[in-house]
Design a protein with these regions (language model features):
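Acidic, low-complexity central loop/insert segments
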Residues: 1-90, 159-160
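Residues that cap or initiate secondary-structure elements
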Residues: 24, 65, 94, 139, ...
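The conserved catalytic core of RNA pseudouridine synthases
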Residues: 42-61, 102-122
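Conserved active-site beta-strand-loop modules that form the wall/rim of enzyme catalytic pockets
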Residues: 57, 85, 96, 120-122, ...
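Short, conserved active-site entrance elements at the starts or edges of catalytic domains
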Residues: 80-81, 85-111
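A short beta-strand-loop-alpha-helix capping motif that often carries His-Thr
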Residues: 85-88, 121, 136-141
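Glycine-rich, small/acidic residue-mixed loop/short-helix segments
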Residues: 107-117, 127, 131-179
Length: 179
């Protein structure tokens, strides 16, 4: 419903979000006897990553119950770089995305592939431009993960046969470029 009154609370000081594998989420579903994509496990919402199932699921837990949730689910805490490497391989930028705000169209950011844009329903910011780009097949650039044998920084040019074909928009260990 448009213009519904909602309240958004910052729970970051009392809750944590964890990433779990798709297999672990399916175990939780089986334990609960549910096939829903969002389930409640011991008062903790757990939901599939709607962008790509290979990115697993999220579980939201209060900090008070976090240790117990980790223990009950037999989870292992792993280094964040494992998840960042997977998301980079899948073409999903995680870090550095705030610098992209207001600089790309949704289609350039792969929103259609990530199911963030549905051309059968409407009403979102930039709908007219996005629909026109889709209709006229005018998508010329796309945000893609890139790799290099040397470090890539924001604004570095991507060249092919000595011609500039793109520009790095997210630098660091897991860079993305608009190509």
């Amino acid at each position: 419903k448009l213009r519904s009154k909602i309240e958004i609370k910052d729970l970051s000081s009392s809750h944590a979000v964890g990433v779990i594998s798709k297999d672990k989420f399916e175990e939780i579903q089986e334990e609960l006897g549910s096939k829903e994509k969002t389930v409640l496990y011991r008062e903790s919402p757990c939901f599939v990553d709607t962008r790509l199932s290979s990115l697993g699921a999220r579980i939201l837990s209060s900090l008070e119950k976090l240790h117990l949730t980790i223990k009950k689910l037999n989870l292992k805490i792993i280094d964040k770089s494992n998840y960042l490497k997977l998301s980079h391989k899948e073409g999903i930028p995680i870090e550095g995305v705030m610098s992209l705000q207001n600089s790309l169209f949704g289609l350039e950011s792969n929103f259609e592939e990530l199911k963030a844009i549905d051309f059968k329903k409407g009403c979102y910011v930039g709908q007219e431009n996005t629909a026109r780009m889709k209709l006229k097949n005018k998508l010329r650039r796309r945000l893609l993960p890139v790799t290099s044998n040397k470090p890539l920084n924001i604004s570095d040019e991507i060249k092919f046969n000595d011609q500039v074909v793109g520009k790095v928009l997210i630098g660091g260990q897991y860079p993305f470029a608009l190509i």
